[in-house]
A protein has these predicted regions:
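Alpha-helical scaffolding within the catalytic cores
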Residues: 20, 165-170, 196-207
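Core dinuclear metal-dependent hydrolase active-site scaffold
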Residues: 1-5, 88-180
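Acidic/histidine-rich helix-loop elements
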Residues: 128-135, 185-202
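Extended active-site neighborhood of metal-dependent phosphoesterases/phosphodiesterases
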Residues: 51-119
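Active-site HxH/HxHxD metal-binding segment of metal-dependent hydrolases
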Residues: 8, 16-78
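Active-site environment of divalent metal-dependent phosphoester hydrolases
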Residues: 14-20, 43-46, 162-167, 187-192, ...
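Active-site metal-binding motif and surrounding structural segment of the metallo-beta-lactamase
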Residues: 1-38, 172-190, 213-217
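Conserved beta-sheet core of the metallophosphoesterase superfamily
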Residues: 199-221
C-alpha cells in the first residue's frame, strides 16, 4: 500500500488475529511509527491449564500474557527501540523510535478532526469465567474498547471484549452510545452448548447492543 508513516497503532489484546502483523511492521525500519497504544506489557491475568478439558476456576495462576505472538511483538518493539538508541543521526533516531503508551480509561486523543476515547485498560480484577476455552476468554476480557467521534458520527470499537468487559465499563459510568457498533469478538456468541440446551436465548453481546443503542452493527465473522 506504500504507507510509510503510522501516527498510532492500537493493540486491543495479544491474539494472533489482532496483532499478528506487528512483528513485521516493527521490523520494517522504513515505516515511521509514532505511538503504539496497548495494555501494560507486563500485565498478568488468571490462567488455567492449556488442556481445555482441565481448565477450571479452581486451578488458576496469575500469568503474564505469554502467547508466542505477544512475545514476538515485545521482542520486535525492544529491538526497534534499541536501534533508535544506537542511531547517531538525529533524523534516523526519531524515525526509528516508537513510543509505547498505556492509555488511561476515559482519556481522549485527537485524530485530526476526529476524537477517540479509551474505555480501558480497567482494573485487573476479572474473575475466571465460563466454560468456553477459558484462557482465550480471559485474554479477551482485556480488550481495549474505544469510541471514535467525527462530527455527528460515532463508532464504538470493541476488539474481542467480553460481556464482563462491557459490564465493567458501564459500571464506571462511561457513555457507550454510538451510531455504529463493531460487534465484539467478530460477532461470535460465547455461550456453551449446555447453556443453549437449557434454553439460553440471549447473545453475550446483548449488553453492549443495549448500551450502544447503535443503528448499525458490523459483524466481521460471526
Amino acid at each position: 500500500m506504500g504507507v510509510k508513516h503510522l501516527e498510532f497503532i492500537l493493540l486491543t489484546h495479544p491474539h494472533q488475529d489482532h496483532i499478528g502483523g506487528m512483528e513485521k511492521i516493527l521490523s520494517d525500519t522504513t515505516i515511521k511509527i509514532d505511538k503504539i497504544y496497548g495494555n501494560d506489557l507486563n500485565i498478568q491475568y488468571l490462567k488455567s491449564s492449556e488442556d481445555k478439558s482441565k481448565q477450571s476456576s479452581d486451578e488458576t495462576n496469575w500469568t503474564e500474557f505469554d502467547t508466542k505472538i505477544y512475545k514476538n511483538f515485545k521482542a520486535a518493539l525492544e529491538a526497534r527501540n534499541k536501534l533508535a538508541e544506537e542511531a547517531e543521526d538525529k533524523t534516523e533516531k526519531e524515525n526509528l523510535k516508537v513510543d509505547y503508551v498505556v492509555p488511561t480509561a476515559g482519556e481522549t486523543i485527537s485524530l485530526g478532526e476526529a476524537k477517540m476515547t479509551f474505555y480501558g485498560p480497567l482494573e485487573n480484577d476479572y474473575q475466571y469465567g465460563r466454560k468456553v476455552d477459558l484462557n482465550t476468554r480471559q485474554e479477551n476480557k482485556y480488550s481495549i474498547v474505544t469510541k471514535i467521534v467525527y462530527g455527528s458520527n460515532s463508532f464504538l470499537m470493541t476488539g474481542d471484549a467480553q460481556k464482563e468487559t462491557i459490564e465493567k465499563i458501564i459500571a464506571k459510568g462511561y457513555d457507550l452510545t454510538a451510531q455504529v457498533l463493531k460487534e465484539p469478538h467478530h460477532g461470535f456468541q460465547d455461550v456453551t452448548e449446555e447453556e443453549l440446551a437449557n434454553g439460553y436465548q440471549y447473545s453475550d453481546h446483548k449488553t453492549v447492543i443495549d448500551a450502544s443503542q447503535a443503528s448499525i452493527a458490523i459483524i466481521s465473522n460471526g
